[in-house]
């Protein structure tokens, strides 16, 4: 009787486990995502879709491709013509971008942060002594939406987070202008907005989920940006489909690739009733309807008519100070950078900032959460590589990240080996092509021709690699006895394998004649 009871309990437990597994399989994991990383063959990927706008175009890679689906990312290339403006958008996934070509001005809107860039020039037609409409608080009235607390700040109390300096600047209510303003500034600001930054070739910049971002091409050539969305990131609470939300403009050709491409995509205002918009923004209904861009067919990249006037600092110096890049104190006090003032970009195309540099071979530069703290929030990082002719990157693998390699110039050969020891990729890669290198897959990169340049995005804020050859390699760390017994070779041969390569990252790729000479020397 006891045995029968135990048998029934065991049977019930097995059925419960099986039921839970089946429920998870049917509800939690869609069929198209099951076994999505069974990659027996890798391909060099090309952009599959192009969406054109008035002043540029966006090219997408199919995020449903097995390789991109495996690593959980979506990739796009933005081409913004001179004078083009990429309208404000935000995503549900973290985004990291690299400027391949050109210069521009970018801005990101972080919810809850103040407008720290202000233009104190008087507006056209503004009369002397007449405040800007909506800024009647200079006489003691609060701004619209402030209430008593904001009104008290006008009586000499500092704003939250200002301190004595800000308080002194606010004592201008008795006739003194705000700190940094003259008589014109006392009349009101022409414009106020959040931080604006210059971007140029070689810049890596990141965007957190939900933070709107815009960019303007201020240069004389097309601004080309390659961007990656980490749709498998924990901050994306939806499915593994890239979702872009537009604050302005309409895209009649579709969304961010994949399943959204067949459906026209409008901005967020289009879904609201015009009367509701008018009440929320305190404007008339006709202007509210204009926000919905119902008849706008320019797309998401529009051409700016006339000069593009935003408050921005002068173009930064070519080299930032080392003190800024490497602060004296290894532990911050929490005041240096907040989410509002945090830098969102870092240039990694400057040879002076290379982590590995050999003039005859090339250079490698990485950016992670230590050099760009915002990457800690998005959990992404990047590596810039340049190989000279007949050079190679020693075989290695990514320990804790997937890698998405994009060729920015030249040609190169890439070989990738999977967990079964099979060569799953051995192809030439050229400008504009993409290669997915899953975590743990070993690979080697060789230049083909004069030069090979690339940018790699990695799905970890502090991605780590392990080399298979060289002075700091896995083989170098093994005892000779392990190598000789593992490969059934003599101790002398094991010594050659372990110590012959002195480089750590880059080396010279031997040509056929050089390789034949080495073999003759070894045989002799």
Curated annotation (Swiss-Prot):
* Region annotation Disordered: where it falls in the sequence: 119-190
Keyword Disulfide bond among UniProt keywords = yes
Q: Which residues carry this modification: Phosphoserine?
A: 53, 97, 259, 366, 484
Q: Which UniProt keywords apply?
A: Disulfide bond, Phosphoprotein, Seed storage protein, Signal, Storage protein, Vacuole
Q: Which residues form the signal peptide?
A: 1-23
Q: Which residues carry this modification: Phosphothreonine?
A: 116, 459, 501
Which residues form each disulfide bond in the chain?
37-70, 113-340
The record's subcellular location field reads: Protein storage vacuole
What CDD domains is this protein classified in? cupin_11S_legumin_C (cd02243), cupin_11S_legumin_N (cd02242)
Q: Which residues carry this modification: Phosphotyrosine?
A: 78
Compositional bias (Low complexity): 124-188
Q: Which SUPFAM superfamilies match?
A: RmlC-like cupins (SSF51182)
Q: How is it modified after translation?
A: Proteolytically processed during seed maturation at a conserved Asn-Gly peptide bond by an asparaginyl endopeptidase to produce two mature polypeptides referred to as alpha and beta subunits that are joined together by a disulfide bond. Phosphorylated in seeds on some Tyr residues in response to abscisic acid (ABA).
Give the protein's biological function.
Answer: Seed storage protein.
Q: What quaternary arrangement does the UniProt entry report?
A: Hexamer; each subunit is composed of an acidic and a basic chain derived from a single precursor and linked by a disulfide bond.
Q: Protein name, please?
A: 12S seed storage protein CRC
Protein source organism: Arabidopsis thaliana
């Amino acid at each position: 009787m006891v045995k029968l009871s135990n048998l029934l309990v065991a049977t019930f437990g097995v059925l419960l486990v099986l039921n839970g597994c089946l429920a998870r399989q049917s509800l939690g994991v869609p069929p198209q995502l099951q076994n999505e990383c069974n990659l027996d063959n890798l391909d060099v990927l090309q952009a599959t879709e192009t969406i054109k706008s008035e002043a540029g175009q966006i090219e997408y890679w199919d995020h449903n491709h097995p390789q991109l689906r495996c690593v959980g990312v979506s990739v796009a290339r933005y081409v913004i013509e001179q004078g083009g403006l990429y309208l404000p958008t935000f995503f549900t996934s973290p985004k990291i971008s690299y400027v391949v070509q050109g210069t521009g001005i970018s801005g990101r809107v972080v919810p809850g942060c103040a407008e720290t860039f202000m233009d104190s020039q008087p507006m056209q037609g503004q009369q002397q002594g007449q405040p800007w409409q909506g800024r009647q608080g200079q006489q003691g009235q609060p701004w619209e939406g402030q209430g008593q607390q904001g009104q008290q700040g006008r009586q000499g109390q500092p704003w939250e987070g200002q301190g004595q300096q800000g308080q002194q600047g606010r004592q201008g209510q008795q006739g003194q202008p705000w700190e940094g303003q003259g008589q014109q500034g006392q009349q009101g600001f022409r414009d106020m907005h959040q931080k604006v930054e210059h971007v140029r070739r070689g810049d890596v910049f990141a965007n957190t989920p939900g933070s709107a971002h815009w960019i303007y091409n201020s240069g004389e050539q097309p601004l080309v940006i390659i961007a990656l969305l980490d749709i498998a990131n924990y901050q994306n609470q939806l499915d593994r489909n890239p979702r872009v939300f537009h604050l302005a403009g309409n895209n009649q050709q579709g969304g961010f690739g994949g399943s959204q491409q067949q459906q026209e995509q409008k901005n967020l205002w289009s879904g609201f009733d015009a009367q509701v918009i008018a009440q929320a923004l305190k404007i008339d209904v006709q202007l509210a309807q204009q926000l919905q861009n119902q008849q706008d067919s320019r797309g998401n990249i529009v051409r700016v008519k006339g000069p593009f006037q935003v408050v921005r600092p002068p173009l930064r110096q070519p080299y930032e100070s080392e003190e800024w890049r490497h602060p004296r104190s290894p532990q911050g006090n929490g005041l240096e950078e907040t989410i509002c003032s945090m830098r969102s970009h870092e240039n990694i195309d400057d040879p002076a900032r290379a982590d590995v540099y050999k003039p005859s071979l090339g250079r490698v530069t990485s950016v992670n959460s230590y050099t760009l703290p915002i990457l800690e929030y998005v959990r992404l990082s990047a590596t810039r590589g340049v190989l000279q002719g007949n050079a190679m990157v020693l075989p290695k693998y990514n320990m804790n990240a997937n890698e998405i390699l994009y060729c920015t110039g030249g040609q190169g050969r890439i070989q990738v080996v999977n967990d079964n020891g099979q060569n799953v990729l051995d192809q030439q890669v050229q400008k504009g092509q993409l290669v997915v290198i899953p975590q743990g897959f070993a690979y080697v990169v060789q230049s083909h021709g004069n030069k090979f340049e690339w940018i790699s995005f990695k799905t970890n804020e502090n991605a780590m690699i392990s080399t298979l050859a060289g002075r700091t390699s896995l083989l170098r760390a093994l005892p000779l006895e392990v190598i000789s017994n593992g490969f059934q070779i003599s101790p002398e041969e094991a010594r050659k394998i372990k110590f012959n390569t002195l480089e750590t990252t880059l080396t010279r790729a031997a040509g056929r004649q050089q390789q034949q000479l080495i073999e003759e020397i070894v045989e002799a």
